[in-house]
């Protein structure tokens, strides 16, 4: 089943798992090297998020997907990466609110 995503604009689009992978990679790159997670772990986390999205029998919002990413990072014990992901998410929300 193809996952549908509700963007913040209200537009419904096809889910793009590469965006999750890229977001986690960026948070990982912003993390001190000794606290980073491996590319394999990033892929595993991305796959778990995709699986959880597939289990939801409806279109899912960007915020819900971001919550799933945060939860999976924390479940993996990647607290510093999760912190960077959450911080970036918060900063982007502030920018959107200011516009």
Regions found by a protein language model. Name each.
Residues 1-99:
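Extended catalytic cores of very large enzyme megasubunits
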């Amino acid at each position: 089943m193809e996952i549908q995503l509700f963007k913040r604009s209200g537009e419904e689009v096809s889910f793009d798992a590469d965006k999750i992978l890229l977001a986690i990679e960026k948070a990982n790159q912003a993390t001190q090297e000794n606290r980073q997670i491996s590319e394999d772990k990033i892929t595993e986390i991305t796959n778990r998020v995709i699986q959880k999205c597939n289990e939801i029998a409806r279109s899912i919002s960007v915020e819900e997907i971001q919550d799933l990413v945060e939860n999976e990072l924390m479940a993996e014990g990647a607290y510093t990466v999760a912190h960077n992901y959450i911080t970036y998410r918060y900063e982007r929300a502030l920018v959107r609110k200011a516009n």
